[in-house]
Swiss-Prot record:
It comes from Arabidopsis thaliana (Mouse-ear cress). Residues 1-21 form a transit peptide. InterPro entries: aa-tRNA-synt_IIb (IPR002314), aa-tRNA-synth_II (IPR006195), aa-tRNA-synth_II/BPL/LPL (IPR045864), Anticodon-bd (IPR004154), Anticodon-bd_dom_sf (IPR036621), Beta-grasp_dom_sf (IPR012675), TGS (IPR004095), TGS-like (IPR012676). The gene is THRRS. HAMAP family: Thr_tRNA_synth. Its main location: mitochondrion. One of its GO terms (biological process) is threonyl-tRNA aminoacylation. It is found in: Mitochondrion; Cytoplasm, Cytosol. Residues 73-135 form the TGS domain. This is Threonine--tRNA ligase, mitochondrial 1.
């Protein structure tokens, strides 16, 4: 096995970093440690920690010995600006290159990319290469710091509680990290956080290097034999897969990495919350404790984030949904939401908005079944790869499944008769109800549900049409996200090591996607080797008003399903049959999830065109109630959502209640307005008042909605 470490990277975990100042525990967001009563499995710790460290050091020493026999030939390292640095094969590390550039860069670079592959800063280079260095202000740097912080968290948890660690990744939402562990009967709470944070501070102060080795499957099983969860993970790995193990201080953990240079780069650490979880999300498996955390390279950023969290709590979509009477969930149908009349208005308006765009962009809407015989899912591959996430049942001794996605049904539509090249591109849109069997512990408001709808569409086109269709989808996404007030970024994920189809088709598809993005004029982030095995994809990450990131839209080329369903069309040479390319795309993604994102993005203040409470008429007294009802009817007949407050409350109280309910327009009417056929208009968040005729007001309403529905 080839060595992946330098001699200096095998320092003992108590050795301080020579290039970075030590971190005091006061730099962490902690309070004095409280003596939380908890059992600690000392026997487990005394058995596993020394054993793992001993095995790690033995394997590491063997790899170090192997390194000595390898040729340390000169290599050229090319930086993004074109500059070339000299180095030695199997000796020079990205950290060495960073130090050549500047001391400041060496003190702040968290991770590198070698020929577009993420690489530890202290891992030797293996030949001539392109090298990029990333700090915390990049996605790659941030995610690496948080991934490494999960290991620091795991170390603190294991040392404090003697728990069996399970998995500890960055969160999928891109805000921090967590670690799952098995604690027996112990349930963690906020009271345990001070001691956990103290353990993390201790690890950071020691500047423990993150050290990497490669192991065989047998070595991994021996190393983690006392942890049944790790053993299960290892046994599930492919036989030919390279297994990597990382160490920081006393923690030796199964991990593919990469990681930051050492623990002292984490200068601010905070536990956020604890919850229960099931092993592998299966309610029939072991109950685990999950601790969420956040970390930063300085205290200022942590303080800013904690302030943001307090602000975000006020606008949690679950709270706003209840307050505005939009939706609710019920224990008799977990993961499937009830949308109340006001919430249904927003839900339908979102779909109408997309349908209006479909009309102008050449999409054809279809309706497909909700359940299919399992034979369909076997053809599509879902039976082998996705069945655990499906709801299945038997009808007349045959197995059926509720659809988790629309693509196989759309393949049947394409397949059901002979197709010609003249019909392409064929853009099929579907708002069909989808069901996915999410674990109960994973359900989270509208953002993680079991029953949902998507603005799902699939484009069947020729190879020559791919570039134009992709550009059209990007323009569609851009228009919608600008309406919502989102910013976004594009990431192109290219061919993985294992892929379906021929190399020429992949190369052309990737080139078409790159050209489409370049023509679109949006910056591109390249994720080499991160595409699906059935085709390259473009990931679209949006940022909302609070600068949180979400992945909603999808754009995926698929070479597999057309083959699985044997889809063909008659080419211009009618004697010849050709295979279409299939493009999966969604703009909103899950309508439920987009509903939640928009509710929080707007902080409950819906724009007029999508608002469930567009206007309310408030009569000053009983004398003007009849006129108020007349105004309400005129506005309603014009197709707008309008209410009337006919209570006997004073007008100031009516207006105040309407403001709190987030009505876009508050229309006050009294005897004067009744006599002139006008209304006194108050617009939300605008102190100025005006008087308008009903006709002028309706024209204003129409102008605010015409573009969208």
């Amino acid at each position: 096995m080839l060595l992946r470490l330098t001699a200096r990277s095998i320092r003992r975990f108590t050795t301080s970093s020579s290039s970075l100042p030590l971190l005091s525990s006061s730099s962490f967001c902690t309070v004095p440690t409280m003596a939380a009563n908890h059992p600690k499995d000392e026997a487990y710790l005394s058995a596993v920690i020394p054993k793992r460290i001993k095995l790690f050091e033995q394997i590491q020493a063997n790899q170090l010995e192997n390194l000595k026999s390898l040729p340390h030939d000169p290599i050229k390292v090319t930086l993004p600006d074109g500059n070339v640095k000299e180095g030695k094969k199997w000796e020079t590390t990205p950290m060495d290159i960073a130090a050549q550039i500047s001391k400041g860069l060496a003190n702040s670079a968290l991770i590198s990319a070698v020929d577009d592959v993420l690489w530890d800063m202290n891992r030797p280079l293996e030949g001539d290469c392109k090298l990029e260095l990333f700090k915390f202000d990049s996605d790659k740097g941030r995610d690496t710091l948080w991934h490494s912080s999960a290991h620091i968290l795991g170390q603190a948890l294991e040392q404090e509680y003697g728990c069996q660690l399970c998995i500890g990744p960055c969160t999928t939402r891109g805000e921090g990290f967590y670690y799952d562990g098995f604690y027996g009967e112990l349930g963690l709470s906020d009271n345990h956080f001070p001691s956990i944070e103290a353990g993390a501070a201790k690890a950071a102060k020691e500047a423990q290097p993150f050290e990497r080795i490669e192991v065989t499957k047998d070595q991994a099983l021996e190393m983690f034999s006392e942890n049944n969860f790790k053993v299960e993970l290892i046994n599930g790995l492919p036989a030919d897969m390279t297994i990597t193990v990382y160490r920081c201080g006393p923690l030796v953990d199964l991990c593919r990495g990469p990681h930051i240079p050492n623990t002292s780069f984490v200068k601010a650490f905070k536990c956020l919350r604890a919850s229960s979880a099931y092993w592998k999300g299966d309610k029939d498996r072991e109950s685990l404790q999950r601790v969420y955390g956040i970390s930063y390279p300085d205290q200022k950023q942590l303080k800013k984030y904690l302030q943001f969290l307090e602000e975000a709590k006020k606008y949690d979509h679950r709270l706003l949904g209840q307050k505005q009477e939009l939706f609710f969930s019920h224990q008799l149908s977990p993961g499937s939401y009830f949308f109340l009349p006001l919430g249904t208005r927003v839900y339908n308006r979102l779909m109408d908005f997309i349908k209006n765009q479909y009309w102008h962009r050449g999409y054809t809407e279809v309706i497909t079944p909700n359940m299919y015989n399992m034979e369909l899912w076997q053809t599509s591959g879902h039976a082998d790869n996705y069945k655990d996430n499906m709801f299945t049942f038997n009808i007349e001794k045959q197995e059926f499944g509720l659809k988790p996605m629309n693509c196989p049904g759309h393949c049947l539509i394409f397949q059901h008769r002979v197709r010609s090249y003249r019909e392409l591109p064929m853009r099929l849109a579907d708002f069909g109800v989808l069901h996915r069997n999410e674990a109960s512990g994973a359900l989270s408001g509208l953002t993680r549900v079991r029953r949902f709808q998507q603005d799902d569409a699939h484009i069947f086109c020729t190879t020559e049409q791919v570039k134009g269709e992709v550009q059209g989808v990007l323009e569609f996404i851009d228009y919608v996200y600008k309406v919502f007030g989102f910013t976004y970024e594009l990431k192109l994920s290219t061919r993985p090591e294992k892929y379906l189809g021929d190399l020429e088709t992949w190369d052309k598809a990737e080139a078409d996607l790159k050209e489409a993005i370049e023509a679109f004029g949006k910056p591109l982030v390249l994720n080499e080797g991160d595409g699906a095995f059935y085709g390259p994809k473009i990931d679209i990450t949006v940022s909302d008003a609070m600068n949180r990131k979400f992945q909603c839209a999808t754009l995926q080329l698929d070479f597999q399903l057309p083959i699985r369903f044997n889809l063909e069309y008659a080419a211009e040479d009618e004697a010849k049959k050709s295979r279409p390319v299939m493009i999966h795309r969604a703009v909103l993604g899950s309508v439920e999830r987009m509903f939640a994102i928009l509710l929080e993005h707007y902080k409950g203040k819906w724009p007029f065109w999508i608002s469930p409470r567009q206007a309310i008429v408030c009569p000053i007294s009983e004398k003007s109630q009849q006129y108020a009802e007349k105004v309400q009817k005129q506005i309603k007949d014009a197709g707008f959502y309008v209410d009337a407050d006919l209570t006997d409350r004073k007008i100031d109280k009516k207006v105040r209640e309407a403001q709190l309910a987030q009505y876009n327009y508050i229309l006050v009417v009294g005897e004067t307005e009744a006599a002139t056929g006008q209304v006194s208009v108050r617009v939300r968040d605008n102190a100025a008042h005006s008087v308008k005729s009903i006709e002028d007001l309706l024209e204003e309403f129409k102008a605010k909605t015409a573009e969208f529905v």
